[in-house]
Amino acid sequence: AAETVVSGAELSLTANSGGEKTPPHAPGLLRRSKRCSCSSLMDKECVYFCHLDIIWVNTPGHIAPYGLGGPFRSKRSLKELFPTKATEHRNRCQCANQKDKKCWNFCQAGKELSSQDTMQKGWDNHKKGKDCSKLGKKCISQQLGNGKK
């Protein structure tokens, strides 16, 4: 007897919260189920939270998502391709279901945490003496002196 392997994407026929079936004009068109859409696929924590049916492979260097380039890719709006100043402070992700409080909290908290992390890293680098661009020769000599200790 032949065995059939079915991926998570093939099992998921809908991604919308209404539970509607695939439209009749597109039979066999499969969509991955997503809790939300991340602003950046480089944000691994967000991708792990949002994409429900991805198999995660633990490689020696890092944990990598397997199967992100699935059989279906939805069209993206021009707003995503050409961001304006109004979208600079966007959320970490956008929830598929606006009533999903856990998702909404994750996306909102993620935005605040990422900006706090950026500010903290900048302050840490300043305290370590790595940012001497505005302080001049005195800063550079202090940095060289700290490196000799």
Swiss-Prot record:
Keywords: Cleavage on pair of basic residues, Disulfide bond, Secreted, Vasoactive, Vasoconstrictor. The record marks W56, V57 as: Cleavage. The keyword Disulfide bond applies. Residues 6-26 are annotated as: Disordered. It is found in: Secreted. The keyword Disulfide bond applies. Disulfide bonds join C36-C50, C38-C46. Residues 93-107 are annotated as: Endothelin-like. InterPro entries: Endothelin, Endothelin_toxin_CS, Endothln-like_toxin. One of its GO terms (biological process) is regulation of vasoconstriction. GO terms for molecular function: endothelin A receptor binding; endothelin B receptor binding; hormone activity. GO terms for cellular component: extracellular space. Pfam families: Endothelin (PF00322). Residues 1-33, 57-149 form a propeptide. Belongs to the endothelin/sarafotoxin family. PANTHER family: ENDOTHELIN, ENDOTHELIN-1. Endothelins are endothelium-derived vasoconstrictor peptides. Probable ligand for G-protein coupled receptors EDNRA and EDNRB which activates PTK2B, BCAR1, BCAR3 and, GTPases RAP1 and RHOA cascade in glomerular mesangial cells. Also binds the DEAR/FBXW7-AS1 receptor. Promotes mesenteric arterial wall remodeling via activation of ROCK signaling and subsequent colocalization of NFATC3 with F-actin filaments. NFATC3 then translocates to the nucleus where it subsequently promotes the transcription of the smooth muscle hypertrophy and differentiation marker ACTA2. This is Endothelin-1.
